[in-house]
Structures are given as C-alpha cells and as structure tokens.
A protein has these predicted regions:
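Beta-strand-rich solenoid/repeat architectures in extracellular/passenger domains
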Residues: 8-24, 36-50, 60-75, 87-101, ...
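Predominantly extracellular/luminal carbohydrate-interaction, adhesion, and secreted-enzyme modules
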Residues: 1-6, 26-32, 52-58, 77-82, ...
Length: 182
C-alpha cells in the first residue's frame, strides 16, 4: 500500500502501478491531519472484500490526476472518504468497481469532507453499487464527470443529506436503478 501518515506526503513520479489483494486491501491511503498522497499517471488495482483504491480519512487528503482505479470485491470502493475534514481532488481519471455495494466514490458520513471530481468516469457493476454514495452532510463538486451503473438498485448519485454540484452525466441500467437519489 502507498500510504501517508504523520504529515507525510508521498508522491508518485512517472508511471506507477499499485496492486494489492485480500480482505481490506488498499491501493493508496492518507490518514491524519497533514497527511497527503499525490498520485499522477498511476494504475491502482485491488481485489478483496472491503478493498479500496484510495482511502482518505481523519483530515487526510489526496490529489489524483490521470489515474485508473479497478476494484473487485464486496464493498470494494474505488475512492473512500471518511471522517470530517478529509479531502480528495480527482481529475482526468477512471474508476471501475465490480462487486456488491462497491461504490465508485463513497463519502461515508463525513461532515465537512470535500471531494472535487473533474473529467472523470466512475463505472460500477454490482448490485447496490452507486457511482457516488454520500449518505451524510458532505460536499462533492463535479466538472464533466460520467457516472455509470449496471447493477440492481445502483444509483448514479445517492446523496442523502449531502450537497452535490456541477456537471455529471449519470446513466443507470437496469430500470431498477435510478440516476439520482436524494
């Protein structure tokens, strides 16, 4: 795992590949105030229950540009943000998840968390796997994002109590899924 703790700021330089497998596997993580990961031209692949491509929590932050994330497993989210004060800036990237409840971007009850998404694809294939899931009072801003779901009851945007702004094109199949649930 590519990880930042205790005010660390690891940065990828050049083409980088991060692969991990097993329950709770992580591709990249930032945890704690001042901890930040910077990913450019990076491929992340995780396999396993509760795996995450990028995991940011407890005031950590991540900058990701021109990356690809591919997760496989139940609740294996592409980008996971937890605890208030955390921040993720994602641009020019692609997220693909395969698994039940494996969301593209999940902001888990993190009041004050900020996620900025620009020119990015988030595609999910599992049942109950929303492209963007934010059940709490968080904020997500989109700029030309494409959100696609293919599983049963998988919303493009599931934003209960959250704020979502910007341009996003959600498409959902089958008919049991919806573009936006607020």
């Amino acid at each position: 795992v590519f990880s930042a703790v205790n005010d660390g700021v690891p940065t990828t330089t050049g083409k980088t590949r991060l692969f991990s497998s097993g329950p709770g596997s992580l591709g990249a993580a930032a945890s704690g105030a001042g901890s930040r990961i910077e990913l450019r031209d990076t491929e992340i692949r995780t396999r396993g229950f509760l795996g995450k491509g990028i995991d940011v929590r407890m005031d950590g932050s991540a900058l990701a540009e021109n990356i690809s994330i591919d997760t496989g497993g139940r609740s294996a989210h592409g980008v996971y943000v937890d605890v208030s004060g955390s921040r993720v800036d994602l641009a020019g990237s692609a997220i693909v998840t395969r698994g039940i409840e494996a969301c593209g971007i999940a902001v888990n009850y993190a009041p004050g968390a900020i996620v900025n998404v620009a020119d990015t694809l988030a595609r999910t294939g599992g049942d109950h796997a929303s492209a963007l899931f934010m059940p709490g009072a968080s904020s997500v801003a989109f700029g030309d994002a494409y959100l696609q779901t293919a599983g049963y009851a998988a919303a493009g945007v599931d934003a209960r109590k959250a704020v979502s702004t910007g341009r996003a094109r959600p498409t959902c199949r089958p008919a049991s899924a919806c573009a936006c649930m607020a």
